[in-house]
Amino acid sequence: MAGQAFRKFLPLFDRVLVERSAAETVTKGGIMLPEKSQGKVLQATVVAVGSGSKGKGGEIQPVSVKVGDKVLLPEYGGTKVVLDDKDYFLFRDGDILGKYVD
């Protein structure tokens, strides 16, 4: 179902489409957190990437992340995109702060 949405939407150039991770709604002690108390989610999973941007010499600079990577996002920014009633966000490759490695 969600995979079909990505076949219909492909980011261009150095854009990266991500799905934010779900916010923690329950603490380790079992206390339910109200929505206002939940922190802003800065971690996401890459679901689609563009082909890259042109460098100064005209060559294509590939995007630095790939589908499936877990990345750290800036607190603000990104463009909200709704696909199959789910929220995703588009960021430029250079705006992504880093990626988590195993």
From Swiss-Prot:
<comment type="similarity">
    <text>Belongs to the GroES chaperonin family.</text>
</comment>
<keyword id="KW-0007">Acetylation</keyword>
<feature type="modified residue" description="N6-succinyllysine; alternate">
    <location>
        <position position="56"/>
    </location>
</feature>
<dbReference type="GO" id="GO:0005759">
    <property type="term" value="C:mitochondrial matrix"/>
</dbReference>
<dbReference type="InterPro" id="IPR018369">
    <property type="entry name" value="Chaprnonin_Cpn10_CS"/>
</dbReference>
<dbReference type="GO" id="GO:0006986">
    <property type="term" value="P:response to unfolded protein"/>
</dbReference>
<dbReference type="GO" id="GO:0051085">
    <property type="term" value="P:chaperone cofactor-dependent protein refolding"/>
</dbReference>
<dbReference type="GO" id="GO:0003723">
    <property type="term" value="F:RNA binding"/>
</dbReference>
<feature type="modified residue" description="N6-succinyllysine; alternate">
    <location>
        <position position="54"/>
    </location>
</feature>
<dbReference type="GO" id="GO:0016020">
    <property type="term" value="C:membrane"/>
</dbReference>
<dbReference type="GO" id="GO:0097193">
    <property type="term" value="P:intrinsic apoptotic signaling pathway"/>
</dbReference>
<feature type="modified residue" description="N6-acetyllysine; alternate">
    <location>
        <position position="70"/>
    </location>
</feature>
<dbReference type="GO" id="GO:0044183">
    <property type="term" value="F:protein folding chaperone"/>
</dbReference>
<dbReference type="GO" id="GO:0051082">
    <property type="term" value="F:unfolded protein binding"/>
</dbReference>
<feature type="modified residue" description="N6-acetyllysine; alternate">
    <location>
        <position position="86"/>
    </location>
</feature>
<feature type="modified residue" description="N6-succinyllysine; alternate">
    <location>
        <position position="80"/>
    </location>
</feature>
<feature type="modified residue" description="N6-succinyllysine">
    <location>
        <position position="28"/>
    </location>
</feature>
<comment type="subunit">
    <text>Homoheptamer arranged in a ring structure. 2 heptameric Hsp10 rings interact with a Hsp60 tetradecamer in the structure of a back-to-back double heptameric ring to form the symmetrical football complex.</text>
</comment>
<keyword id="KW-0143">Chaperone</keyword>
<dbReference type="GO" id="GO:0006457">
    <property type="term" value="P:protein folding"/>
</dbReference>
<feature type="modified residue" description="N6-malonyllysine; alternate">
    <location>
        <position position="40"/>
    </location>
</feature>
<dbReference type="GO" id="GO:0046872">
    <property type="term" value="F:metal ion binding"/>
</dbReference>
<feature type="modified residue" description="N6-acetyllysine; alternate">
    <location>
        <position position="66"/>
    </location>
</feature>
<feature type="modified residue" description="N6-acetyllysine">
    <location>
        <position position="99"/>
    </location>
</feature>
<keyword id="KW-0496">Mitochondrion</keyword>
<feature type="modified residue" description="N6-succinyllysine; alternate">
    <location>
        <position position="86"/>
    </location>
</feature>
<dbReference type="GO" id="GO:0005524">
    <property type="term" value="F:ATP binding"/>
</dbReference>
<dbReference type="InterPro" id="IPR020818">
    <property type="entry name" value="Chaperonin_GroES"/>
</dbReference>
<feature type="modified residue" description="N-acetylalanine">
    <location>
        <position position="2"/>
    </location>
</feature>
<protein>
    <recommendedName>
        <fullName>10 kDa heat shock protein, mitochondrial</fullName>
    </recommendedName>
</protein>
<dbReference type="GO" id="GO:0001649">
    <property type="term" value="P:osteoblast differentiation"/>
</dbReference>
<feature type="modified residue" description="N6-malonyllysine; alternate">
    <location>
        <position position="54"/>
    </location>
</feature>
<feature type="modified residue" description="N6-acetyllysine; alternate">
    <location>
        <position position="80"/>
    </location>
</feature>
<keyword id="KW-0346">Stress response</keyword>
<feature type="modified residue" description="Phosphothreonine">
    <location>
        <position position="79"/>
    </location>
</feature>
<dbReference type="InterPro" id="IPR037124">
    <property type="entry name" value="Chaperonin_GroES_sf"/>
</dbReference>
<keyword id="KW-0597">Phosphoprotein</keyword>
<feature type="modified residue" description="N6-malonyllysine; alternate">
    <location>
        <position position="56"/>
    </location>
</feature>
<feature type="modified residue" description="N6-acetyllysine; alternate">
    <location>
        <position position="40"/>
    </location>
</feature>
<dbReference type="GO" id="GO:0070062">
    <property type="term" value="C:extracellular exosome"/>
</dbReference>
<feature type="modified residue" description="N6-acetyllysine; alternate">
    <location>
        <position position="56"/>
    </location>
</feature>
<dbReference type="InterPro" id="IPR011032">
    <property type="entry name" value="GroES-like_sf"/>
</dbReference>
